[in-house]
């Protein structure tokens, strides 16, 4: 099978400790993609496309299961994308940016408030192709992040050229 592995920037608005970003990152890495994670240190839901102006942005390494997972920053989702592009990974030319997997729906007018969508929009402004992914299970069922992560991995398999 001919597949093009991609350099993928991952962020979210639920924070680096959220199950959605961790599940997606693990799946993409298992498949062989180069995945670079920069996410808020805490839940930043509802931050839209906001940026941090009144305090210095700081980032530090985040470990998961005893291994380097990515960087967490004390800013908003759009800050994560900016900092990844212009500082942390300034020498990397990303093929794609994925924001998510978000916990909860982002439908209709929700997009105006969504930090998940805001991070993807920032990537687009920085000339990085982007996707934002949200998951809402009806009737209070448990979120199935594995299903969505598998779907995204297969979706990326199906496209050889994301230009």
Indicate where each model-derived feature is located.
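Glycine-rich, Lys/Arg-enriched anion-binding loops that position phosphate/diphosphate groups
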Residues: 116, 125-163
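Alpha-helix C-terminal capping segments
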Residues: 84-91, 120-129
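A cross-family phosphate/adenosyl-ligand binding-site feature
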Residues: 2-11, 18, 22-87, 91-93
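Short, Asp-centered acidic motifs that coordinate Mg2+ and/or phosphate
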Residues: 96
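Short beta-strand segments
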Residues: 11, 38-40, 99-102, 133-134
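Glycine/threonine-rich flexible loop motifs
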Residues: 105-114
């Amino acid at each position: 099978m001919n597949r093009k592995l991609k350099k993928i920037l991952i962020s979210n608005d639920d924070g680096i400790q959220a199950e959605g970003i961790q599940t997606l990152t693990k799946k993409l890495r298992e498949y062989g993609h180069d995945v670079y994670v920069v996410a808020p240190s805490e839940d930043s839901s509802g931050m839209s496309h906001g940026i941090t102006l009144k305090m210095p942005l700081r980032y530090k390494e985040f470990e998961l299961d005893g291994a380097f997972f990515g960087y967490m920053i004390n800013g908003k989702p759009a800050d994560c994308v900016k900092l990844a592009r212009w500082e942390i990974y300034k020498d990397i030319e990303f093929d794609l940016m994925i924001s998510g997997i978000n916990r909860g729906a982002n439908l209709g007018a929700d997009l105006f408030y969504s930090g998940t969508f805001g991070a993807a929009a920032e990537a687009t402004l920085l000339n990085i192709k982007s996707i934002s992914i949200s998951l809402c299970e009806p009737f209070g069922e448990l979120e199935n992040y594995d299903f969505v992560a598998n779907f995204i991995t297969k979706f990326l398999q199906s496209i050889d050229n994301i230009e």
